[in-house]
């Protein structure tokens, strides 16, 4: 009779290569379906990590910085001002500070590092300027009514003036540094530390703003803010407008083409 055709011998499946265990040659759709849970979890973790990093406030160790929580920082003052409804932010350059304009207070630390022209631009800006720290500084170009002085005091100081902000503060726990004032130029001094030497002073600026000087920058730091009337004076001297721009001239880079008028 006719013999049955010989059956072709098929290659045996490799041991352990069951369904789903063979990757080579697996359709891309199947791979994606298998990887989908892993991809979803990875994406979720990335989102959580990003959100966490964004929610964590950044801090610095720069003296007098509004994001410095240490004793030499001013983060507490910045928070108090925000609690009063102010919008508080930092300026990165002298040109940005000078562009603030009316309706803004610009707090300036290390003002002596600016040029005469940069200080003059601040004076003409129309903004209120509050100088934080007068010791070893230079006011040329800013005002002719005040001159930084080295006279200091360690005892409690009383206002001895009619300025509303100084009267509200009531007292300062001394002052490292001071300013002399020229009353004929419209300047007035408070909290005297000696003859014609004051821990706080004010004057009118040519641009229409008001100049206020807190001679001792340490008075507004986290470590000293709770003493005497420091907080009251700082909040009032910086809180006359809803916008506060904090500018530390020591943290500003050298003038670039973007900073030139």
Description of each model-found segment:
Residues 1-261:
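Short, surface-exposed patches at the edges or C-terminal ends of soluble domains, predominantly
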């Amino acid at each position: 009779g006719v013999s049955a055709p010989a059956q072709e011998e098929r290659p045996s499946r490799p041991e352990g290569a069951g369904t789903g265990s063979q990757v080579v040659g697996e359709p891309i759709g199947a791979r994606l379906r298998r990887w989908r849970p892993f991809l979803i979890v990875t994406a979720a973790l990335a989102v959580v990590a990003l959100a966490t990093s964004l929610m964590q406030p950044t801090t610095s160790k720069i003296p007098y910085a509004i994001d410095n929580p240490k004793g030499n920082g001013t983060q507490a003052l910045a928070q108090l001002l925000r609690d009063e409804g102010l919008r508080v932010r930092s300026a990165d350059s002298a040109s940005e500070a000078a562009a603030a304009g009316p309706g803004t207070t610009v707090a300036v630390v290390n003002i002596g590092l600016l040029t005469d022209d940069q200080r003059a631009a601040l004076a003409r800006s129309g903004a209120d300027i509050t100088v934080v720290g007068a010791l070893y500084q230079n006011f040329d170009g800013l005002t002719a009514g005040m001159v930084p002085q080295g006279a200091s005091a360690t005892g409690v100081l009383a206002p001895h003036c009619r300025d509303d902000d100084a009267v509200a503060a009531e007292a300062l726990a001394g002052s490292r540094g001071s300013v002399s004032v020229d009353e004929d130029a419209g300047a007035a001094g408070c909290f005297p530390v000696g003859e014609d030497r004051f821990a706080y002073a004010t004057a009118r600026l040519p641009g229409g703003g008001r100049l206020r000087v807190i001679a001792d920058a340490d008075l507004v730091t986290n470590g000293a803010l709770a003493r005497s009337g420091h907080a009251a004076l700082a909040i009032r001297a910086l809180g006359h407008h809803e916008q506060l721009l904090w500018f530390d001239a020591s943290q500003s880079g050298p003038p670039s083409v973007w900073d030139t008028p």
